[in-house]
Amino acid sequence: MEKRIQQASKFGKVAVLMGGSAAEREISLKSGKAVLEALRSGGIDAEGIDVGRDLIAPLLERRFDRVFNVIHGRGGEDGVLQGALACLRVPCTGSGVLASALSMDKLRTKLCWTGAGLPTPPWLRLDSPDDLERCRQALGFPVIVKPAEEGSSIGMSRAATAEELAQAWERASGYGCAVFAERWIDGVEYTGGMLKGVPLPLIRLETPHAFYDFDAKYRADTTRYHCPCGLDTGREAELQALVLRACQIVGVSGWGRVDLLVDRSGQPWLIEVNTVPGMTDHSLVPMAAKAAGIDFQELVWHILETSFA
């Protein structure tokens, strides 16, 4: 059972870890600033720490009672930080080592979901250019090519021809991790947040881009977010149950966000799970929480409570 904390002093000294050295560093800094301001507004003794490649040194220099982690991507969302904090016996928000590591790796997440009978688009790992023809035969076109361990759609490309597939593989292979192609799903994109085991309202995403890429997420002013999502109550509840099951299968706890697509026939497809979603006041989890009647300050309080789990 999740613990409820009524007094700010019970949290003790809180380190808000942000930044990191991954490609999502700037987004993490924005998330960290928003979280820090909200925690302090709630009377919590919190200190922001801009972490570089050395995640541990700042925590050894000063004593903290717990960590609010908003480092996105590698180093902060992949189990590395979670393992280090476990060794230091410093409680942290969100998922533990195993769930963080699994969720950061999109390929292994898909393997877990497939093994549990959950729907995720067919895919093929691309280890070299020699796999591209096999990809064409197995998946057809179009496909979306992804680095397995990057967030915010970094390194992703849609490919509708053999030439585009080769270019997409070249781009994705530059991120130092496995690369895979996934069958393109023509449909509507949703994202579903989870807070302490309870689903948040779904958000429907609408963008003129080919897909919800980095520009659509952080730069474009043409992206539209619909919450309520427009589905009837029963259908939304079905997708929310799928979101919770997707989290459960990979062990995500505390809070997180699952991205999914619903094709033209109504079939849902799980895409990925985020264990440290964006936390600016314009990010998706805060947006969904607001629709559920939870303001930003209350949201960060609830997330910090997950460090007691």
From Swiss-Prot:
This is D-alanine--D-alanine ligase. Keywords: ATP-binding, Cell shape, Cell wall biogenesis/degradation, Cytoplasm, Ligase, Magnesium, Manganese, Metal-binding, Nucleotide-binding, Peptidoglycan synthesis. ATP binds at residues 136-191. Its cofactor is Mg(2+); Mn(2+). It comes from the Bacteria. One of its GO terms (molecular function) is D-alanine-D-alanine ligase activity. Cell wall formation. The keyword Nucleotide-binding applies. Belongs to the D-alanine--D-alanine ligase family. It comes from Methylococcus capsulatus (strain ATCC 33009 / NCIMB 11132 / Bath). Mg(2+) 2 binds at residues 272, 274. Binds 2 magnesium or manganese ions per subunit. One of its GO terms (biological process) is regulation of cell shape. It is found in: Cytoplasm. Mg(2+) 1 binds at residues 259, 272. It is an enzyme of class 6 (ligase). Pathway: Cell wall biogenesis; peptidoglycan biosynthesis. One of its GO terms (cellular component) is cytosol.
